[in-house]
Each structure stands twice: as structure tokens, then as C-alpha cells.
Swiss-Prot record:
UniProt name for this protein: Uncharacterized membrane protein YndD
Cell location: Cell membrane
Main localisation: membrane
Pfam family, one: GerA
């Protein structure tokens, strides 16, 4: 008996739930009664003062209509021009075909052809679609007797002009950079060259505040498995809002615990196109000038577009300098600590005597000395970034000089320590990719602690630990340490040394591209 009652209760509860769901679905659908529909839309939108409801009438047909748009998001001039029959109250522009056909009854086709002169028009019967599109800048047109709304593309373009990227300045190369407007960025990609294989696939991301996202790839070059993996990860993004592409980067990367960036960010359209021509995939998000490129390797983070715009010999030397600068950034303070504290015998005698003389009177061990200067430099660097542009760089340079000189005169640090820290800071600026530079700067503190505890052996152990991590790391299935591990001899033509373009006839083997030949 009790089981029967429980089953009956569950059945009644299920019927109530189904009825409630059906009722909600009915409430989300337009009825064609403009007064009733407007009340439902207003209730759905809530108390938003920037949303305008403009009730009008097509006087020649005696049909009521209404416009719904957001002030500032919708282009008023475009609304006035595209809906001049309604907005400007010009009934004489309604053709006789409409006024005579169907005894004054408008059809969807007639509205699009005779009343609306805006090209981008979408039909929808759902109130939720109306609210969503209105808050994205569209204008909703409701007409009495028609149980559907016409969503007009009246988004007001508020983008800045195309400028040179601030974070990737070049001596030689294009001066164009991405903007915050997605349509402008896709146009910049198209303008890089005529090619019918450039594919731009659009997605919608964000569970509450929705944004457009585009993945770009060369259809005849990119590995289909990589493209499908990018699609899968983009579809798997479930977050309220994506204000910047950095959110996308953190949500799609392979190992979120790794200090190394596994996605390359760039403001340069030429760099994106170069990546696409190698078989990579680009991700562009509306509202940010930074595009993402996947898959990537560690060596890519030390490369600059200018490497390919200059001749191969100077480009190779400069690239080699960047690799050396990366090692200096990571290990210079640690090597100083290990040599001073554990292995002074490895230093040449004259240099050891000179260093010993400069350290007389310094009350702190080499680790504390190095930490003090490194932290001071990082604070100055951060302060220089946050201060206004006219005074930011000056504060960083002058502040570093003053603090270094004052610390030496006070006997807190030695002059050789100031030289080491300055060399480390300058070397970090030679790294083209900002996120990689930050990673190396933070990782050097770990190397310093290992050097303070175990000396040179600690530095070697730390290097092996980082190397093993980099070797295990992957970016969308591509080994992060390629082409060193796994070993691809042909890809070494564009590794530490950049060989002449006539020698680099094929695309990177690690990308597993369908079309491998790029120079005939």
C-alpha cells in the first residue's frame, strides 16, 4: 500500500513538473498579440533603464509595431535609415502591394522586403532570444498579428583604429595589429593574402555573458586531429564570462599546473598567418586584441616575426642570443650564489680576490643579498608597468640605479651582485614572449634556493627537473620540447639557428600537416 502511494506521489510530481516545463515554454513563445508580448518581454528584461521600448504604428495599414533596443549598443542612425517607414512615420513608402494583399495582413517576407532595409535580419519566436540579442546590440521589431520578432543587426561599432602592437614592436615588419573588434580582426587575416582555404569557424562561448569566438586554420594544411581537438576544448568551455583571451588560454591548455605557457598569444596578424601556414590553429575572441596560436613549442616562445624578415645570418645570431638570455635569466643569480657560497675554488684567482674585496662588510649571505636585489627589481618593473606611460620607464630606470647605488653604499649588497641582477633583468627583456619571460623570472627564485642549499649540484638538479618537465609537456598533442625531443633533424633548420628560406622547403614535421611542401 505504501509503495503504491509513493508511486502515485511520484507520478503526480512528474505531471506537475512536466506541466510547469510546458508552461514555461509557452511563456517563452510570442503569441502575436503585441500588448501581451511586450509585457512578457519587459518582465524578462527587468528594471534596465537603458533599454528602450518604442511603440509605433504603420498608419497606412493601421498595424501596431514596437522597437526594442539598448541605448549605446544599437546604432540610432542605422535604425532610422533601416526602418524609415516606422521610425520616420512615412506611410507613403509602404507599397500598394502590401496595402492591398491580404487585406492589410503583413507577412514575414513583406516585412523584410518593404519595411526593413537592413541586410542582417533574423527571425525568432522565443522571448529569450529577443532579450539575448537586444543586450548584444540588435534591435527587435515586433508587429501586431505576427507571432515572431525580427532581430535586426544594428550593433554600434565602437572599435579603435588599427595601430602598431605595443607588446610586439618590430624594426622591420607590418605595423598593423589586432583590435578589440572581432570582425576587424578577421578582416585583417583575410587581407594577409587571397586564399580560399582559410577557414574561420564561429563559436559562442560564455554561459551568462555570451561572446563570439573564432578558430582559424588552413583547411588543406592543418592536421584534422588538431583542429578537432581545438573544437572539442572550445566547446567544453563553461564559464560565466570571458573578458579576455587569457581566460580561453587557461581553460584549454594541457597542463594548468605548468609554469610554462602552452598557448602563444600575439597581437600581430602576420604572426597568426605564419602560424596557420605551418599547420597551426588560431583562436580569436571578441573584445580583445590578443589572438591565441596552438600548438606551440618552447622554441617558438623565443622566436620573433622579425627573424624571418631579416636575412638568415643576423637573424640566427639574434635568435641564439635570445636562448643565451633565457639561460642567464633563469640561472645567473643561482650560479653566483653557488660559486660564492660553495665553490669559490672554481672562480679564477684574480676574479675571486676582486669579488671577495667587494663583499667585505656585507652582513648578509649571498642568498639574502640576491633575494633583496631581485625582489627590488621585480617591484620596480611592476611599478613601471602600472604607472602612466610618460613616467613609468623613467621610474624603473632611475629607481633601479638609485636603489642599487644606495644599497652598495650602505653595505647591504656587493657591487658584483648589482651587476648580476642588472644582467639578469636586461636578459629577461630580450625574451619576445611576455608570458615566457614571466615564467623564467619566477622560476629563477627556485634555482636560487637550490643553489643556496646544494650549491652547483642543486642548480644542475633543478635544471634536470625543469628539463624533464618540459620534455613531458605537450601542447595539443605536440611535444613542447620539439624538435629537440623527440628529435626531428629537418625541423632543426628553424630551431636555434634559422637557415635560409630556400633551405626551409617543408613545413615542420612535428605538425603532421597534410601539405608539407611550402617552397618549390
Amino acid at each position: 500500500m505504501m509503495r503504491w502511494r509513493n508511486n502515485q506521489y511520484k507520478t503526480q510530481k512528474q505531471h506537475k513538473s512536466d506541466y510547469s516545463t510546458a508552461e514555461k515554454q509557452d511563456q517563452d513563445v510570442l503569441t502575436g498579440n503585441i500588448g501581451y508580448d511586450l509585457e512578457h518581454v519587459k518582465r524578462k528584461i527587468g528594471h534596465n533603464g537603458d533599454v528602450h521600448f518604442r511603440e509605433l504604428e504603420i498608419t497606412q495599414l493601421h498595424v501596431k509595431a514596437a522597437l526594442i533596443f539598448v541605448e549605446g549598443l544599437s546604432d540610432q542612425d542605422l535604425i532610422n535609415k533601416g526602418l524609415s517607414v516606422l521610425v520616420m512615420n512615412q506611410p507613403n513608402q509602404v507599397s500598394d502591394e502590401i496595402s492591398q494583399s491580404g487585406k492589410g495582413i503583413l507577412t514575414s517576407k513583406q516585412i523584410k522586403n518593404q519595411i526593413v532595409s537592413i541586410g542582417d535580419v533574423i527571425d525568432s519566436e522565443k522571448i529569450s532570444d529577443i532579450v539575448l540579442n537586444v543586450f548584444m546590440g540588435s534591435t527587435a521589431l515586433l508587429i501586431d498579428g505576427i507571432p515572431q520578432a525580427f532581430l535586426l543587426g544594428t550593433v554600434k561599432k565602437q572599435n579603435r583604429s588599427i595601430e602598431e602592437p605595443l607588446s610586439e614592436a618590430l624594426v622591420r615588419g607590418p605595423r598593423t595589429g589586432f583590435t578589440e573588434e572581432l570582425s576587424t580582426n578577421t578582416a585583417l587575416l583575410r587581407q594577409q593574402g587571397k586564399n580560399d582555404q582559410l577557414t574561420l569557424q564561429r563559436f559562442e562561448v560564455g554561459t551568462r555573458l555570451k561572446k563570439d569566438l573564432i578558430i582559424a586554420y588552413m583547411n588543406d594544411i592543418a592536421d584534422p586531429k588538431v583542429v578537432e581537438e581545438v573544437r572539442k576544448r572550445v566547446r567544453g568551455i563553461e564559464i560565466d564570462h570571458l573578458p579576455e583571451s587569457g581566460y580561453v588560454e587557461q581553460l584549454i591548455e594541457d597542463n594548468y599546473l605548468s609554469p610554462f605557457p602552452q598557448v602563444q598569444s600575439t597581437e600581430r596578424p602576420d604572426r597568426v598567418i605564419s602560424g596557420l601556414m605551418e599547420g597551426r590553429v588560431a583562436i580569436l575572441l571578441d573584445g580583445t586584441p590578443f589572438a591565441l596560436i596552438v600548438p606551440v613549442t618552447f622554441s617558438m616562445m623565443l622566436q620573433s616575426p622579425e627573424d624571418y624578415y631579416e636575412r638568415w645570418f643576423p637573424s640566427s645570431l639574434i635568435r641564439l642570443l635570445r636562448f643565451i638570455a633565457a639561460m642567464i635569466t633563469l640561472f645567473a643569480p643561482a650560479l653566483y650564489i653557488s660559486f660564492i657560497s660553495f665553490h669559490p675554488g672554481l672562480i679564477p684567482t684574480k676574479l675571486a680576490i676582486s669579488i671577495s674585496g667587494t663583499r667585505q662588510g656585507v652582513p648578509f649571505p649571498s642568498l639574502i643579498e640576491a633575494l633583496f636585489m631581485e625582489v627590488a627589481i621585480e617591484i620596480l618593473r611592476e611599478a613601471g608597468l602600472r604607472l602612466p606611460k610618460p613616467i613609468g620607464p623613467a621610474i624603473g630606470i632611475v629607481g633601479g640605479l638609485i636603489i642599487g647605488e644606495a644599497a652598495v653604499q650602505a653595505g647591504i649588497v656587493s657591487p658584483i651582485m648589482v651587476i648580476v641582477v642588472a644582467l639578469t633583468a636586461i636578459s629577461s627583456f630580450a625574451i619576445p614572449h611576455y608570458s615566457t619571460g614571466i615564467a623564467l623570472r619566477m622560476l629563477r627564485f627556485g634555482a636560487m634556493f637550490c643553489a643556496a642549499v646544494f650549491g652547483l649540484f642543486g642548480v644542475i638538479m633543478y635544471y634536470l627537473l625543469l628539463s624533464s618537465h618540459v620534455v613531458k609537456l605537450k601542447s595539443f598533442g605536440v611535444p613542447y620540447a620539439s624538435p629537440a625531443v623527440p628529435y626531428h633533424l629537418k625541423d632543426w633548420k628553424d630551431f636555434v639557428i634559422r637557415m635560409p628560406l630556400l633551405v626551409m622547403k617543408r613545413r615542420p614535421k612535428m605538425m603532421n600537416t597534410d601539405n608539407t611542401k611550402r617552397v618549390k
